[in-house]
């Protein structure tokens, strides 16, 4: 076996980044679920005010960690530290994650958090058993859309998700004409 000519040393960082990627995903999905970006679009806030407005009952340190995680991922900006920190949306978050804006693209991410995240957690079982790992699991019915139309709430969430994921295509189409 020959080794490719390269001066680069093997590096596990990409493996670790992808393997632990659910940390970043869940931070973003929870922030969307809490409508944090909508809250911060109207006013910059400190961690204490955010904790109160969102009804969080965890420790202040956990709130700092949650918010600072979002800062490190580029979804929030921060001025100051700890109790003196003021948090605001990053430009992208302000445009695409504020539910009150027509540019809101979080619908697909809401569905990812509410439905898909759990199902992907059962990928191993699905591969081993061949059984569906979504709402049709155990029902013997593989017709996802039939089940979807039975629940107005799930249908609305699905439609919002599809709208969010297609928004960029619609904008491109309009720009062409």
Which role fits each region the language model picked out?
Residues 2-6, 11-49, 53, 60-177:
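Conserved Class I S-adenosyl-L-methionine-dependent methyltransferase catalytic core
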